[in-house]
Amino acid sequence: ILTTQGERFLEEERARREKMKAANELIEAASMETESGLEDILLVRKLLEGYAAEACAERIEPKELQKLKDLQADYLYAIRHGRAGSEEDLALHLKIAHLSGSPSILRMLKLILTDQDAYARFNQAAVRSDEVRENEHESLLAAIEAGDGALARWEMERHLEHVGENLQAYFAGRK
């Protein structure tokens, strides 16, 4: 005999498993091994992270802004000391998603970016010079600090456009 509460639990668990299956299928479809796979992931990132940056800018508190600045400082420290900075960059992007106030956006980005060390592999293909990397987040963080959601979205999308341009150059060099 199954209670109403038990039925509800089983239905929620079934729905959760279906969502995880669909998310895993998306990840498999957008293989990290191909140019088109990386471009697909970049397109999804632009949608999710553009929204996240806008929402973050519109709701951020000074204490949270300082956390973003600290993550940016960690990122700059890493690349200035010869490291790729992938982990620090990922932390910054996920913090912006967290500060958007949308747990769903954060979960989707974590799923897309952390599966099979995807972010480090993405970063390896997309990043070309330390100078570009050092300046890449500055205008985004300034828009967030100003509380300008529309500008923050635009800056995030512009940032990811630069990543896309670097991806194209990376794959052109491999052909």
Annotate each language-model stretch with its function:
Residues 1-47:
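Short linear motifs at protein or domain termini
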Residues 2, 33-40, 60, 81, ...:
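Non-transmembrane, amphipathic alpha-helical segments
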Residues 44-60, 88-127:
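Hydrophobic, amphipathic alpha-helical faces that serve as interaction scaffolds
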Residues 64-78:
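Amphipathic alpha-helical segments enriched in hydrophobic/aromatic residues interleaved with Lys/Arg
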Residues 65, 85, 106, 152-153:
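Solenoid-repeat scaffolds in large eukaryotic assemblies
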Residues 111-175:
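C-terminal all-alpha effector/ligand-binding and dimerization domain
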